[in-house]
């Protein structure tokens, strides 16, 4: 578990299903996320799969970590309002992916920045990571702005790079080195 001023980042649990459903079923939230609008059954299935296959340690290529963001105190204490993921792409190269998604009612309040910055710090400190990468759809400038705020730089734009949810899309690649993050 990772603690920030306002959040507890922890592994997903089946008790989180109602909170997860609130944003994972929202078409605006999942527009740039690689899953469809989810039903309650799909949220349960995804949570069970994450619990069964997710890791708390990144040691081998393909290992991934998913942490939900739980509000620590106040009116929404105990509510899950988002999640971050980190996946080891290459142990040898020290490369890992990072991503985030925020509940629609809790956007633009600094939660995603707070949670993702804490996960970046945790990842660089505890795992064999030297470089974090975020792949961001070019139609999602808000996520690109967040990556920039986190200190990541845009390294590339891949034009018409993939078919995503039935449409051809371009992608930005953002990255940060461990040495840059520690400055």
Model regions and ranges:
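GNAT-family acyltransferases
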Residues: 1-105, 122, 165-183
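Structural signature of beta-strand start/N-cap positions in the alpha/beta core
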Residues: 8, 130-131
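Structural motif
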Residues: 27-28, 127, 151
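Short amphipathic helical patch at the helix-1/turn junction of helix-turn-helix
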Residues: 34, 137-138
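Positions that flank functional sites
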Residues: 39, 139, 162
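Conserved acetyl-CoA-binding loop-helix of GNAT-fold acetyltransferases
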Residues: 100-102, 108-125, 141-149
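Conserved catalytic-core motifs of GNAT/GCN5-like acyltransferases
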Residues: 133-135, 153-171
């Amino acid at each position: 578990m990772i603690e920030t001023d306002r959040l507890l980042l922890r592994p997903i649990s089946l008790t989180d299903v109602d909170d997860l459903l609130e944003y994972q079923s929202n078409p605006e939230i999942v527009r740039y996320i690689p899953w469809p609008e989810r039903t309650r059954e799909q949220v349960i299935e995804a949570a069970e799969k994450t619990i069964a296959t997710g890791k708390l340690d990144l040691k081998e290529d393909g290992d991934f970590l998913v942490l939900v963001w739980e509000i620590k105190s106040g009116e929404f204490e105990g509510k899950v309002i988002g999640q971050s993921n980190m996946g080891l792409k290459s142990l040898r190269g020290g490369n890992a992916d990072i991503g985030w998604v925020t509940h629609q009612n809790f956007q633009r309040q600094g939660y995603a920045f707070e949670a993702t910055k804490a996960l970046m710090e945790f990842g660089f400190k505890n795992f064999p990571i030297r470089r974090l990468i975020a792949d961001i759809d070019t139609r999602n400038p808000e996520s690109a702005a967040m990556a920039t705020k986190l200190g990541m730089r845009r390294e590339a734009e891949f034009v018409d790079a993939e078919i995503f949810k039935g449409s051809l899309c371009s992608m930005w690649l953002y990255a940060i080195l461990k040495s840059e993050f520690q400055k």
